[in-house]
Amino acid sequence: MAAAALRDPAQVPVAADLLTDHEEGYVTFEDVAVYFSQEEWRLLDDAQRLLYRNVMLENFTLLASLGLASSKTHEITQLESWEEPFMPAWEVVTSAIPRGCWHGAEAEEAPEQIASVGLLSSNIQQHQKQHCGEKPLKRQEGRVPVLRSCKVHLSEKSLQSREVGKALLISSGVLKHQVTHTGEKSHRSSKSREAFHAGKRHYKCSECGKAFGQKYLLVQHQRLHAGKKTYECSECGKLFRDMSNLFIHQIVHTGERPYGCSNCGKSFSRNAHLIEHQRVHTGEKPFTCSECGKAFRHNSTLVQHHKIHTGVRPYECSECGKLFSFNSSLMKHQRIHTGERPYKCSECGKFYSHKSNLIKHWRVHTGERPYKCSDCGKFFTQCSSLMQHQKVHTGEKPFKCNECGRFFRENSTLVRHQRVHTGAKPYECRECGKFFSQSSTLMQHRKVHIGEKPFKCNECGRLFRENSSLVKHQRVHTGAKPYECRECGKFFRHNSSLFKHRRIHTGEMQ
């Protein structure tokens, strides 16, 4: 068959669908073989020749498993020994002429102008109407229809890998498709015929117990257990078990995206990806959790969600041993150990380990405060800040210190307080080695070393390292004296001044 002559694989008919009631016979290797002349063989590159070899051998193996190929042909022997399997040009053309149908306008068209292709077409129904009308395929019990050849004109343009690959893929696919419709050739006894029509599956996988109605399906399935991947991508070297999967994969390299979304125009390389994408527009969520009823667009998302109910946490951090339900959660967690901060604020250049933290930080620049307190109307940038604030109104203080019995609104505040009892000072200054009980105190202290004074008095321009120092200083300008002595009623600007004054009344200064 001259696959080299394909102008467009979509113009080539499906051989199995060209059968008429009176044209059925037994399948032989010749009916599904693909042949090239010496001139055509030279046009194939190494990847195309390898693909050709794999398809021919697979077709022969399939027919042999069905009892339809009793001995190896000369061509198969050539392929196994890696010899060039081309035929003379006249033999390629005339080998299938008696069974063919013609694309030429006249039946007398010269054989030299045509080539046997016997492959399939993506436009099946159109071709059927041209040649066979709309007769349905009628199967005679116990017989396998012959794949008929169809002639098309030779093309002048060079072979393209995609055309040859699709043609060869189709050659193999037609044979498998035909066997699926007709059953195996070995319906020799009434018992086996009855078993086939009854839908029985006699071919059982010894590994997993799965049963199949046809032997070739079992052979294909067993590749899963054997890990056998015989089809290699010439672009990246990736291996596949089935040629159909290789063909689908090659779209990645060609960049072809034939499936377009009618709603937004986005294109996809596979129809399955388009179907999944369209759920964004339709809102369809066909995958429902049997535990909680939550629905998802993708089955993979449902599978991940199930881990919440099962408690399965297969992903373990090698640094601290913490377990996670999802690999993505583990990867985010590991940034704590690596210090990686891939998310950068475009306004101030600050980096964050998680995108969610960057989004929260971004509100500092935009001024957005989407969370409102229903009690006092105050707005907050984060939901967690609102929840903490609401405890002010409820008076809730659920966190208790076991040492002194004091209560706190937040657990973080309790943890900081407990350092008063334990004396823990986990925060060390790298400059001078001084330790602090709180991170905020360390940050304030570090300004001593770097000389940073970010807080400026608007009245006199004086700079301060801490905001609290600025607040105290501003009382000089405002005259505010918020601290009152309960003994004599005198007021003071600073709490420290009041503390010293009280010694007069207690007699400590004497």
Curated annotation (Swiss-Prot):
Residues in cross-link Glycyl lysine isopeptide (Lys-Gly) (interchain with G-Cter in SUMO2): K166, K176
Localization annotation: Nucleus
InterPro entries from the UniProt entry: KRAB, KRAB_dom_sf, Znf_C2H2_sf, Znf_C2H2_type
Gene Ontology, cellular component aspect: nucleus
Gene source species: Homo sapiens
Primary location: nucleus
UniProt superkingdom: Eukaryota
A GO MF label: DNA-binding transcription factor activity, RNA polymerase II-specific
UniProtKB keywords: DNA-binding, Isopeptide bond, Metal-binding, Nucleus, Repeat, Transcription, Transcription regulation, Ubl conjugation, Zinc, Zinc-finger
Protein name, per record: Zinc finger protein 419
Alphabetized PANTHER family for the sequence: GASTRULA ZINC FINGER PROTEIN XLCGF26.1-LIKE-RELATED, ZINC FINGER AND BTB DOMAIN-CONTAINING
GO process terms (BP): regulation of transcription by RNA polymerase II
